[in-house]
Amino acid sequence: MVKEISVGNVKIGGDRPLVLIAGPCVIENEVATMRCAERLMTICNGVSIPLIFKASYDKANRTSVNSFRGPGMKDGLKILKKVKEALGVPVLSDIHSIEQVEPAAEVLDVVQIPAFLCRQTDLVVAAARSGKVVNIKKGQFLAPWDMENVAGKAVSTGNDNIILTERGVSFGYNNLVSDMRSFPILRKIGYPVVFDATHSVQLPGGLGGSSGGQREFVEYLGRAAVATGIDGIFMEVHDDPEKALCDGPNSVKLEDLPALLKKLKAIDAIVK
C-alpha cells in the first residue's frame, strides 16, 4: 500500500485522486510568479484537482554559465512565501546544498532533491531531517528499483514523508525516454509517485547553449503515466513558453492546461 502524505491542505498517495504539481520552471520575477500561481489556482479549482505550486529560486544546473538562473535563494523564498500566504497553496522548490535546507524549510512545504543530486546522501538526509515532505526526483541515470535505497536514506532519519518523481531516463545523447514500467515499480517502494511530464520531454543540451524540448508529447506521456495509477503529475507551465527564461521548449502553455487536466482526471478516475 502506498503511503498517504499531507502537504499543507493537499493529500497525495494512498487511494487519493491525482494531484498537480505545477508552476514556472524558474522564478522570473514576483509579478509573473504570482500571476502564474493565481491562474493555476483558478484552473485547478475549475477542474477540482489539488495543486502544489512549484518554482525554482535557483536553476543551478543550467546548460550554460550564461543561462538565467533565477533570483537566488533569499529573494526567491520571499516570493514563494508571498504566494503561499496570499493563495493558501502549498509550495515546492529544489535545494542544491546542505546549507540551503534550513532556510528553505522555513518556507517550503515540499523540499525537492534534483534528479542530478538524488544520490547525494548528505543532501537527502539533511532534507529529510528538516521534517518537511521530501520530493526526490529519480536521476536520469538510475533504474526505478534503485530508488528504494535512495528513499531509505531519507527514512533513516525517521521522516517517511517522501514522494518519488520519475522524469525520464537518458537514451543516447540529448534525449530522454519514459518507461511506463517504472511507475508500478516505484509505487511498490511504498511512497507516492509523481510523473514529471515536462522534463521527460526535454532534450538536454539539445540546443547547444540550452536544452530543447518536445512539448507536443507532454499530453501523450501524461495520459499514459496517469493510466498506471500514479499519485501526481508534475508540469512546468508558462503563459508564453516561447519567451520563458528557462525550459520554454518543454513547458505547457497555461491556456492549454484546463483541457489537458480534464483528460488526465478522467483517466485517473477510471484506474483508481
Swiss-Prot record:
It is an enzyme of class 2 (transferase). It is found in: Cytoplasm. GO terms for biological process: keto-3-deoxy-D-manno-octulosonic acid biosynthetic process. It catalyses: D-arabinose 5-phosphate + phosphoenolpyruvate + H2O = 3-deoxy-alpha-D-manno-2-octulosonate-8-phosphate + phosphate. Pathway: Carbohydrate biosynthesis; 3-deoxy-D-manno-octulosonate biosynthesis; 3-deoxy-D-manno-octulosonate from D-ribulose 5-phosphate: step 2/3; Bacterial outer membrane biogenesis; lipopolysaccharide biosynthesis. Its main location: cytoplasm. GO terms for molecular function: 3-deoxy-8-phosphooctulonate synthase activity. Its EC number is 2.5.1.55. Keywords: Cytoplasm, Lipopolysaccharide biosynthesis, Transferase. Belongs to the KdsA family. PANTHER family: PHOSPHO-2-DEHYDRO-3-DEOXYHEPTONATE ALDOLASE (PTHR21057). This is 2-dehydro-3-deoxyphosphooctonate aldolase. It comes from Geotalea uraniireducens (strain Rf4) (Geobacter uraniireducens). The gene is kdsA.
